[in-house]
């Protein structure tokens, strides 16, 4: 696996989103707009980001 770290920033609210998208945001450790987390980059995490790509911004560190 890679040693890259990525920063995930929630930029939009989950109001009006599906249950799957809300659960994914919670699993990522986010909850409200402007919350951010730093996690190790891996394929599983990239899949979660793809589900909520319209709600988050991703930066590679």
UniProtKB/Swiss-Prot annotation:
The keyword Protease does not apply. SUPFAM superfamilies: Ribosomal protein L30p/L7e. CDD domains: Ribosomal_L30. Keywords: Ribonucleoprotein, Ribosomal protein. GO terms for cellular component: cytosolic large ribosomal subunit. It comes from the Bacteria. The keyword Ribonucleoprotein applies. Transmembrane segments: none annotated. InterPro entries: Ribo_uL30_ferredoxin-like_sf (IPR036919), Ribosomal_uL30_bac-type (IPR005996), Ribosomal_uL30_ferredoxin-like (IPR016082). GO terms for molecular function: structural constituent of ribosome. One of its GO terms (biological process) is translation. Pfam families: Ribosomal_L30 (PF00327). NCBIfam families: rpmD_bact. Part of the 50S ribosomal subunit. Belongs to the universal ribosomal protein uL30 family. This is Large ribosomal subunit protein uL30. It comes from Chlorobium limicola (strain DSM 245 / NBRC 103803 / 6330). The lineage of its organism: Bacteria, Pseudomonadati, Chlorobiota, Chlorobiia, Chlorobiales.
């Amino acid at each position: 696996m890679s040693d890259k770290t990525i920063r995930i920033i929630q930029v939009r609210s989950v109001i009006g989103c599906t249950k799957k998208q809300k659960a994914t945001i919670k699993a990522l450790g986010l909850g409200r707009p402007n919350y951010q987390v730093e996690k190790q980059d891996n394929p599983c995490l990239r899949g979660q980001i793809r589900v909520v790509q319209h709600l988050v911004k991703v930066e590679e560190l």
